[in-house]
Each structure stands twice: as structure tokens, then as C-alpha cells.
């Protein structure tokens, strides 16, 4: 927001330059990003046109322009150039804000000695709806005077970068309060009063939802004449970046800037009845707002309505059906307090943020509404020639009660780490508008209505610290702080990430918001997935409009982006949350670990680089589980995952609980992403993984006795997974069986149709004795018997 230095001086005497003021405000937490002088106009003055004549054969005009000292001959194409009128005039050598330097030049045989200017050429906003042409200056403008003096541009703008809690400083008055506290000078704030009359407000006001509208005031002004505002008012708006419209609307915008109170003007004759109803919109109700857009409302939104229809979206924008135009004769001026949360939600749902909604969202001064409304009414009467009809209407269901905070100075000293002078503390708080009552052990601070951000004792400490000056606080080292260890959850997460990094993977972090088209690329039903997905109401873009239910889209996008940049060999992982709808409650969050392998793994002096494959990624997961102390893991073929190759995919189990999958990306998905090499991916449920980690590791001493290995070759049906044989053998619970390893699988014609040979190595060992041949043979017999009974396996003898 831009604040005029000159305008601030109307509220408070300022002993600082604009630059110094910016630094002072920043030091007390009102950040001033930059201070800009806006009167940089050289050789641009008020010019009076003395004569106008047409240039033969053209649509141009030859004029004589006086600067009081000299007369210049100027050619212009503007249609609104008339003798006796005054306009901004650029002398030869003048440099305009758009970078153009004005020089004498010949136009159609006439030497033009300068240029008459429009508002746009001066870098100013044109009045809305104004005919294009020269900027007309008031008759009283002194001929030859510098244009920055006449247009009040001999001024500085302070560009503020406010924190969200300081909505009170979104106005000249709010900043002036801070300036008064800084300087110690009195704040000049008059309370305008209406002339006495005996009538009441001719418009009835009804608030149906006091929670969303805490106060509503209005006043009727009749016999107004809508037209352009005086130059000084237009210039105040222009300096703040607001385009002038007409004297009625300009006054409401002026009050918005000066007091921070949004107002709205209705054409009273366009209302169906002389009544204002503040109510919730009805489901499906529509309104065309002033920007010409028809908007559908919901029952959560607050509207201003007459007897028949909505006429404004409360706190955001008025409707076209009651817009003030050139034919308006009677206006109703609204000033109100609307619930900040309600305004914010409505603005977000409608995708409509305005200067008014910005202020309502940050809470306006409910006690300052009357001051703003009365001043606006008096200004309209002065500038538009109207008269106030009756009194103002004021519906105020629950009067404001100031919050009183008990403040202990000893606790404040402990909090701030410095000694405080009670008298100075009271001075600071009173200069900021707080009322202070001194008690025996505490002071009691009454918070003004325009500071809703102050609600706790700690907030008062902050106010004190701001004006004591943070630079005056001594540097001290922390005392008595002991370090604490990391939580078990953090330690486990750190361990998993370290293990994956040790296995050659690199961690990435991607956005939680994805493009819904990502599901289509993965071969999933978009409609089906979206029923479970959290869809954003107001996304930054369609590419980030849905919260992810899987980590795959982010992993694949990053891998493809790197491949496009010739980084084709990747081994990446991500640990992050995915989100799923959970009825009316907050979304369900689950933490997953996802990974992707692409291209070739690095070779060495005796091995050439080899492509990442299914077994390499499977080996990463096996190593991870083993390092975490998990031995009871298994894999089973998965043919029903649409984004994975049906013959090169598996589900991952820990203790018979499915926790994820791995596999090669489906060829169709690979084609959609246009990968050159085939990606391998995996995804594990991290939250489940945490619960399946053994509570503690038990020490098992090494056996001093020799191990015995036996190999068997089995003839089995081709479709039986290799893991089945391991599960059957483990199910025998032979306590001396230490290791089971499948070391060969063979298929050939001599085995017979749909048959394969699988070779298994078994390792036996005891910590108590050397196992005898008879014991080993007995164990092997148990194994063969169980395998034959449960899988139909036969001992292969050929």
C-alpha cells in the first residue's frame, strides 16, 4: 500500500523527512519498502491555450499556448483543445514518465514547440469513462506554474509492506497514529457532526445474521449531481493507485484510503423498496457484480439485499442493479462491519478480492464506522450538491466492549530481558491510543477498537518493545537452556533416509499439489481417483489443483525433467505425505516412501554400466528391510496395477501385511511421459513400516560348530512363485535351519510342459553341537515331504 507523505502531515506534525520517516516506521515494525518522490517533472507547466485553428487538410489543430512569460506554437490532435482552457504543457527539452523527450519538430509544415499532455502521458490514471484527450486543469491553476505543484505531485509515497495482523495501518489514519506515537505530537482527528434535523433515516435496516454483520450504518443523500470530482480529490486517489470514477464513488474511495473504512454507494431509486436486509444468500441465488460478471452465490455467503434481490456481496463488491451512474439523484451510503473470516471465505470462493475485502478480512474499526460515514456524507453534499435526508440509520446488535489486559511489569521485564521504567511504559501505551489504569502491582490496559490484534499480555510487551527500540536491547546469551534429544519418530525417519542414501539414492522433495491429468497418465480412472482426492477450491493453477494421493506423479515429473536435461541416470527417493478425503473431517494424511530408478547404474574398472532393472530395485528394498531388522518380508507377483508392467511388478509384504509395491513402469505410461529409458518405481507405506519394526534386537552368539549345507532341485509347476517354497520351509520351524536361498531356476523341454526346476540351498547349524548326518537327513526328509504335500514338488533326479 502507498501512503502520501503530504496526506500524513494533515493528521500529525512530522519533524522528519520522508526518508527519515520511512526508517523510523520500519524500526517500530511498520515496514516501509521504499520511499519515492513522484514530482520528477522537468519543464512541464500549466499552459493556457490562447488560439486554436485547424491545420488545412488534416485533423490536427495549430494552437498558441501561453506560459505567462512566453507564447509557443503547438500542434495537437486532441479533440478537446479549446481557447481559454488550461492544460499540462511540456516545454521543449521536457522528459515524460514514459521516457519520451519533447523536442521542437515540424508537423505538416508547422514547427510544434512543445506538447499538450493527457493524464496518461503524465503517468497518471485517466478517469474511468472519460473521453480520450488532454487533461483539463482547473481555471484557477496559475499559468506557468510547475505541474507538480498544481497536481499535488510534489510529494513522496511510502510503500508499506504490512504484516497480516496490522490491518489498522491500511489507511492514512492508521499510519498517522504510529507517526504521532513516534514524534510525540498530537494526532489531529476531528469528529465530524451532521447538522441537526428532526427526521429519521428513510431506509429501514435489518440484520438477519449478527455473527456475520456486527454493525450496519447507512445514510440517504438526495438531489445529488453525479459528475467529475475536483482535481485535488482525483489526485489523492491517483497517488494511491485508484482510478477516479465520479464524485460519489470517489468520496467512498477517499474515505477508504483515509480511514480504512470501506463504504458503498447505492442508487436508492433502483432498490425495490426503501429497506436494506443483511442476510445469507439463498442457494443458487445469482448477482451480477460491478465488474460485469454474473456470480452464483451459496448459503454461506452474506449479501446486502432489498425485498426482492441481492444488491451487493457483503464486504466485497456491489451489484450492477443498484450502481451509481450519471442519472442517479438519490444515494444510500453504506458503512458496516463484516466478519473477517466470512469475507475471506466468500472472496476466495468467488475468486474476487477487492480493496474493500482486503480491509474487511483484516478487521475494520467497528467504532470508527460512524466517523467515516458522516465525513463521507458531508463531502458528498459539498462536492455533489446533495442534502442529507433525515438522520443516519445504525443497527448495532452487540455493542463493542473494550478488552482490558492486566500487565505485570516484572513479568514484562523478565520477558523482554531489560529493566522498564513504569512512567515510560505508560507514555508509550497512551501514545498508541491505549488507556492505562495503574494498579498496586499491575497496570490495566484498555485496548482500542482499532487494534483487534492486541489480545494477550505478550502483545502489550511487543508494543512496549517496539517503541523502546529493538536496537536498544542489549545482546545477551541464552541462560539455562538445555538441549533435548530428537524424538524417536524423527530418529527413525532420519535412519530410513540415511539407509536409502547409503544405497546410492538421492532425496527429492516435490509439491503436494498435482495436476489431475497425472492420474490419466498413470492409467487410472481420473473420475474415480478424484472422488477420493482433496480438490482445491482456489488453486494457483490447474497444474496444482489436486492434493496428491500417490508420490508417483512428482517422482516421474522430476525424472523426466532431468532426462530432458541429459541427466539420464537417476536413483531418487521421496518421503512425503499423501492426502485422501475423510468425509466431513480433515483429509486423511499418510506418509509414504517412493523411489524411482532410471537409466544405468555406474560401472567400475571391471564392470560396464548396467541398466537398472526389477531385481536391482528389489535388492534396495531387501537391504532396507534387513538394515531395519526386518527379516519376515516377501514379494508376490502383481498384475493388476495399471501403471506397472504386468509381468515385472510385485507387491511388498511385511509379516503378511501389504505395505507397497515395486515394478517396471507400464510401456503405455512410459510412452505418455516420453521416457527414453524404462523407469523402475516403488512406493511403501512409511506409517505402516514404522509399526512393523521389531521392538528390540536380541543378541544371538555365533555357533562354534560347523554349518552344514544341502542343495535340492525340485520339479514344480511353472506358475508357482519361488517365494512359496521358502514360506513352506519356514513354516516347519526347524530351529537349526539358519538360511534358505534359491540359487537357480531352469525351464526346458526335457522337463515337460508347464514345468520348471528350482534349486534351493539350505544351511543348518546348532549352537550346542555338531549336527549328525542322520539329523540332517531327517530335516531334509521333513522339507521334501512338506513341499510335496503343499506344492506338488518332486525331487528332480535328472
From Swiss-Prot:
Residues 400-475 form the B5 domain. One of its GO terms (molecular function) is ATP binding. The keyword Zinc-finger does not apply. Gene3D superfamilies: 3.30.56.10, Bira Bifunctional Protein, Domain 2, Ferrodoxin-fold anticodon-binding domain, Nucleic acid-binding proteins, Phenylalanyl-trna Synthetase, Chain B, domain 3. InterPro entries: aa-tRNA-synth_II/BPL/LPL, B3/B4_tRNA-bd, DNA-bd_dom_put_sf, Fdx_antiC-bd, Fdx_antiC-bd_sf, NA-bd_OB-fold, Phe-tRNA-ligase_IIc_bsu, Phe-tRNA-ligase_IIc_bsu_bact. Its EC number is 6.1.1.20. It is an enzyme of class 6 (ligase). Mg(2+) binds at residues 453, 459, 462-463. Residues 38-148 form the tRNA-binding domain. GO terms for cellular component: phenylalanine-tRNA ligase complex. Belongs to the phenylalanyl-tRNA synthetase beta subunit family. Type 1 subfamily. Tetramer of two alpha and two beta subunits. This is Phenylalanine--tRNA ligase beta subunit. The lineage of its organism: Bacteria, Bacillati, Bacillota, Clostridia, Thermoanaerobacterales. The gene is pheT.
Amino acid at each position: 500500500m502507498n501512503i502520501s507523505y503530504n496526506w500524513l502531515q494533515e493528521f500529525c506534525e512530522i519533524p522528519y523527512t520522508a526518508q527519515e520517516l520511512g526508517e523510523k516506521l520500519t524500526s517500530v515494525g511498520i515496514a516501509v519498502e521504499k520511499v519515492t518522490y513522484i514530482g520528477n517533472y522537468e519543464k512541464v507547466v500549466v499552459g493556457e491555450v490562447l488560439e486554436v485553428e485547424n491545420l488545412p487538410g488534416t485533423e490536427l489543430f495549430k494552437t498558441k499556448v501561453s506560459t505567462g512569460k512566453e507564447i509557443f506554437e503547438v500542434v495537437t490532435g486532441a479533440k478537446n483543445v479549446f481557447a481559454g482552457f488550461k492544460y499540462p504543457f511540456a516545454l521543449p527539452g521536457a522528459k515524460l514518465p514514459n521516457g519520451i523527450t519533447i523536442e521542437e519538430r515540424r508537423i505538416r509544415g508547422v514547427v510544434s514547440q512543445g506538447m499538450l499532455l493527457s493524464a496518461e502521458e503524465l503517468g497518471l490514471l485517466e478517469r474511468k469513462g472519460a473521453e480520450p484527450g488532454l487533461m483539463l486543469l482547473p481555471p484557477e491553476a496559475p499559468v506557468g506554474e510547475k505541474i507538480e505543484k498544481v497536481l499535488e505531485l510534489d510529494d513522496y509515497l511510502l510503500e508499506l509492506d504490512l504484516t497480516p495482523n496490522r490491518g489498522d495501518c491500511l489507511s492514512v489514519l492508521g499510519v498517522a497514529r504510529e507517526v504521532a506515537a513516534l514524534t510525540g505530537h498530537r494526532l489531529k482527528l476531528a469528529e465530524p457532526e451532521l447538522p441537526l434535523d428532526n427526521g429519521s433515516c428513510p431506509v429501514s435496516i435489518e440484520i438477519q445474521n449478527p455473527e456475520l454483520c456486527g454493525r450496519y450504518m447507512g445514510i440517504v443523500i438526495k438531489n445529488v449531481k453525479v459528475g467529475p470530482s475536483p482535481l485535488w480529490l482525483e489526485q489523492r486517489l491517483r497517488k494511491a493507485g485508484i482510478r477516479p470514477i465520479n464524485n460519489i464513488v470517489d468520496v467512498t474511495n477517499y474515505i477508504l484510503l483515509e480511514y480504512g473504512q470501506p463504504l458503498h454507494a447505492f442508487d436508492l431509486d433502483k432498490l425495490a423498496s426503501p429497506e436494506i436486509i443483511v442476510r445469507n444468500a439463498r442457494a443458487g441465488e445469482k448477482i451480477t457484480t460491478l465488474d460485469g460478471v454474473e456470480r452464483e452465490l451459496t448459503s454461506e455467503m452474506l449479501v446486502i439485499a432489498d425485498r426482492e434481490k441481492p444488491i451487493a456481496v457483503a464486504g466485497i463488491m456491489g451489484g450492477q442493479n443498484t450502481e451509481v451512474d450519471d442519472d442517479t439523484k438519490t444515494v444510500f451510503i453504506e458503512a458496516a462491519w463484516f466478519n473477517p473470516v466470512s469475507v475471506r471465505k466468500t472472496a476466495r470462493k468467488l475468486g474476487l478480492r477487492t480493496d474493500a475485502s482486503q480491509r474487511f478480512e483484516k478487521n475494520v474499526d467497528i467504532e470508527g464506522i460512524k466517523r467515516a460515514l458522516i465525513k463521507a456524507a458531508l463531502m458528498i453534499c459539498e462536492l455533489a450538491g446533495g442534502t442529507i435526508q433525515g438522520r443516519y440509520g445504525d443497527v448495532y446488535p452487540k455493542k463493542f466492549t473494550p478488552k482490558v489486559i492486566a500487565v505485570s511489569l516484572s513479568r514484562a521485564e523478565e520477558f523482554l530481558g531489560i529493566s522498564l521504567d513504569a512512567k515510560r511504559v505508560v507514555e508509550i501505551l497512551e501514545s498508541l491510543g491505549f488507556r492505562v489504569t495503574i494498579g498496586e502491582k499491575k497496570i490495566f490496559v484498555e485496548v482500542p477498537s482499532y487494534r483487534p490484534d492486541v489480545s494477550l499480555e505478550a502483545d502489550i510487551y511487543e508494543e512496549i518493545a517496539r517503541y523502546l527500540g529493538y536496537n536498544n536491547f542489549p545482546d545477551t546469551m541464552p541462560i539455562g537452556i538445555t538441549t533435548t534429544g530428537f524424538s524417536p519418530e524423527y530418529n527413525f525417519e532420519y535412519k530410513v533416509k540415511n539407509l536409502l542414501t547409503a544405497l546410492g539414492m538421492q532425496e527429492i522433495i516435490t509439491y503436494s499439489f498435482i495436476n489431475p491429468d497425472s492420474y490419466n497418465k498413470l492409467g487410472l480412472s481420473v473420475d474415480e481417483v478424484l472422488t477420493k482426492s482433496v480438490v482445491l477450491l482456489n488453486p494457483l493453477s490447474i497444474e496444482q489443483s489436486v492434493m496428491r494421493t500417490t508420490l508417483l506423479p512428482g517422482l516421474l515429473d522430476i525424472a523426466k525433467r532431468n532426462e530432458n536435461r541429459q541427466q539420464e541416470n537417476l536413483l531418487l527417493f521421496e518421503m512425503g505425505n499423501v492426502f485422501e478425503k475423510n468425509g466431513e473431517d480433515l483429509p486423511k494424511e499418510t506418509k509414504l516412501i517412493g523411489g524411482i530408478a532410471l537409466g544405468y547404474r555406474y560401472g567400475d574398472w571391471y564392470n560396464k554400466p548396467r541398466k537398472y532393472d526389477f531385481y536391482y530395485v528389489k535388492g534396495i528394498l531387501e537391504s532396507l528391510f534387513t538394515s531395519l531388522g526386518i527379516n519376515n518380508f516377501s514379494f508376490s507377483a502383481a498384475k493388476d496395477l495399471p501403471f506397472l508392467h504386468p509381468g515385472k511388478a510385485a507387491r511388498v509384504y511385511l509379516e503378511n501385511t501389504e505395505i507397497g509395491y515395486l515394478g517396471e513402469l507400464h510401456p503405455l505410461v512410459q510412452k505418455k511421459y516420453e521416457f527414453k529409458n524404462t523407469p523402475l518405481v516403488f512406493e511403501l507405506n512409511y506409517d505402516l513400516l514404522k509399526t512393523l519394526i521389531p521392538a528390540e534386537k536380541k543378541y544371538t552368539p555365533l555357533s562354534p560348530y560347523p554349518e552344514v549345507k544341502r542343495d535340492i532341485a525340485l520339479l514344480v509347476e511353472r506358475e508357482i512363485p519361488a517365494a512359496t517354497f521358502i514360506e513352506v520351509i519356514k513354516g516347519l520351524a526347524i530351529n537349526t535351519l539358519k538360511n534358505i536361498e534359491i540359487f537357480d531356476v531352469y525351464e526346458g523341454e526335457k522337463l515337460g510342459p508347464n514345468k520348471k526346476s528350482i534349486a534351493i540351498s539350505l544351511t543348518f547349524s546348532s549352537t550346542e553341537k555338531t549336527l549328525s548326518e542322520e539329523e540332517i537327513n531327517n530335516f531334509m526328509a521333513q522339507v521334501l515331504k512338506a513341499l510335496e504335500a503343499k506344492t506338488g514338488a518332486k525331487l528332480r533326479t535328472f
